[in-house]
UniProtKB/Swiss-Prot annotation:
NCBIfam families: PRK03147.1. Thiol-disulfide oxidoreductase which is required in disulfide reduction during c-type cytochrome synthesis. May accept reducing equivalents from CcdA, leading to breakage of disulfide bonds in apocytochrome c; following this reduction heme can be covalently attached. The lineage of its organism: Bacteria, Bacillati, Bacillota, Bacilli, Bacillales. Belongs to the thioredoxin family. ResA subfamily. Coiled coil: none annotated. Pathway: Protein modification; cytochrome c assembly. This is Thiol-disulfide oxidoreductase ResA. Keywords: Cell membrane, Cytochrome c-type biogenesis, Disulfide bond, Membrane, Oxidoreductase, Redox-active center, Signal-anchor, Transmembrane, Transmembrane helix. Disulfide bonds join 74-77. The chain crosses the membrane at residues 11-30.
């Protein structure tokens, strides 16, 4: 009787394992991936900033947008934030907006980070990772350079120097 129970249990485990493998293969090979690519239109979204104001990407049409995905725990993100903050007022006057998308952290953590670095550009929080997933963001930081027409011009993964950020901001001036 025990041998039969073990056989049934092993068969059930094997079936569950095969179903999981089948599902993984199906989702990887047969479902459409909607990764954002250079030359494509940036997916629109609405997120709320630390002050409670809504930011809709499409509201920035006519401006260049430096769309930066980041986290408070991300050391490379921490290194580039002061550079972004320093360049923000200069390029804002020239029609370029910096919009930092925090990836689902508690508002209090993000506020403390912003206060610590004196950040002045808009910071929005993607609480359910919907925007993160829509843009198919992998490692942080990841930045999308979006032109005045809403087209993705470049995707940068990894930390940037001040010179890199300045060059990229220049490239999306309207």
């Amino acid at each position: 009787m025990k041998k039969q129970q073990r056989l049934v249990m092993r068969t059930a485990i094997l079936l569950v394992l095969l179903a999981a493998i089948g599902y993984t293969i199906y989702t990887n090979f047969f479902t459409e991936k909607t990764a954002v690519a250079v030359g494509s239109t940036a997916p629109d979204f609405v997120l709320t900033d630390l002050k409670g104001h809504e930011h809709r990407l499409s509201d920035y049409r006519g401006k260049g947008v430096f769309l930066n995905f980041w986290g408070t725990w991300c050391k490379p993100c921490e290194r580039e934030m002061p550079y972004m903050n320093e360049l923000y007022p200069i390029y804002k006057k020239q029609g370029v907006e910096i919009l930092a998308v925090n990836v689902g952290e508690p508002k209090l953590s993000v506020e403390k980070f912003a206060e610590r670095f004196g950040l002045t550009f808009p910071i929005v929080i993607d609480r359910q990772d919907q925007v993160l997933n829509a843009y198919n963001v992998g490692p942080l930081p990841t930045t999308f350079l979006i032109d005045k027409n809403g087209e993705v011009k470049q995707i940068i993964t990894g930390t940037m120097t001040k010179e890199d950020i300045e060059r990229h901001l220049e490239s999306i001036k309207p």
